[in-house]
């Protein structure tokens, strides 16, 4: 049984509504500039002449991906030819484009990108520094950052206006990273917007291995992600961190299996500055 199918069967609330796309730009895609001040080049090179300068949040249309790749701060990405203001054309490095594509709430634009990649050891997964920014009229209002240790692909979900009914918040962003394969971790980063500030939630990490085991982490809000998935039964200003676990072990004499499964949910705590994950999330006692 595949890991994707296992997640669907055991914990359909987690991935049933997933609408992620691999962050790879195609012709006619529209996105925003992620960098603060970005020089648009005449060719796909950092030494080419500058034809224009764009600021964070400026909208661009992808003409096409080039064969040229550049590595900056450990991040290797291709260059793209783009079209921008007044039908001008030029080239920018992929790391300066937002992976969130068009994510807007009124006059605020949200962008995200990888700012750095470090591989501590040859046999360890790379650590990616990811940043999300809220921008109005070219000015960065606020930004939050996180480090994800994962070499899978980066995915994103559409901006969720209303933040799933969480009182005091206007929107929810979710950035994901991982492999769609057994035995590899899958990370989810939730970011909340209250109209003036971005609040980052602690990372969720899930992993599954065929029909052997599955460990799924997620956040539950007052409202579910879709009409078929209910929210939690707590208050409107509460977020719950939930872990669901399932494992199957064959008996030594091959006469059968032992199955173990449990679910645990605990409220996050707001300390006045940030949301803190509950610490009492261990394996339930028999």
Each model region followed by its residue ranges:
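Hydrophobic beta-strand positions in blades of beta-propellers and related beta-sheet-rich domains
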Residues: 40, 127-134, 188-191, 247, ...
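Terminal domain-start segments
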Residues: 97-158, 257, 281-282
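Boundary regions of SH3-family modules and the immediately adjacent low-complexity/disordered segments
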Residues: 22-25, 74-118, 186-205
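Short, solvent-exposed loop/turn segments at conserved positions within beta-propeller repeat blades
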Residues: 73-75, 121-128, 182-186, 258-262
């Amino acid at each position: 049984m595949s890991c994707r199918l296992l997640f669907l069967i055991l914990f359909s609330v987690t991935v049933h509504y997933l609408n992620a796309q691999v962050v790879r730009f195609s012709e006619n895609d529209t996105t925003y500039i992620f960098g603060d001040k970005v020089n648009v080049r005449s060719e796909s090179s950092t030494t080419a002449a500058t034809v224009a300068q764009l600021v964070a949040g400026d909208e661009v249309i992808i003409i096409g991906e080039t064969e040229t790749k550049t590595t900056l701060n450990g991040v290797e990405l291709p260059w793209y030819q783009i079209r921008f203001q007044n039908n001008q054309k030029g080239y920018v490095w992929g790391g300066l484009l937002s992976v969130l594509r068009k994510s807007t709430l009124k006059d605020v634009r949200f962008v995200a990108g990888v700012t750095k990649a470090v591989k501590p050891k040859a046999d360890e997964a790379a650590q990616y520094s990811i940043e999300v920014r809220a921008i109005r009229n070219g000015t960065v209002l606020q930004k939050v950052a996180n480090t994800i240790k994962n070499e899978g692909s980066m995915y994103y979900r559409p901006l969720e206006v209303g933040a799933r009914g969480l009182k005091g918040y206007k929107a929810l962003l979710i950035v994901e990273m991982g492999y769609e394969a057994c035995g590899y971790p899958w990370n989810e980063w939730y970011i909340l917007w209250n109209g003036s500030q971005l609040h980052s939630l602690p990372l969720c990490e899930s992993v599954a291995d065929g029909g052997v085991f599955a460990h799924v982490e997620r956040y539950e809000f007052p409202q579910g992600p879709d009409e078929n998935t209910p929210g939690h039964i707590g208050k409107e200003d509460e977020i719950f961190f939930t872990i669901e676990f399932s494992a199957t072990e064959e008996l030594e004499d091959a006469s059968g299996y032992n199955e173990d499964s449990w679910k645990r949910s605990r409220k996050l705590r707001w300390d006045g500055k940030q949301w803190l994950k509950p610490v009492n999330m261990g394996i339930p006692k028999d």
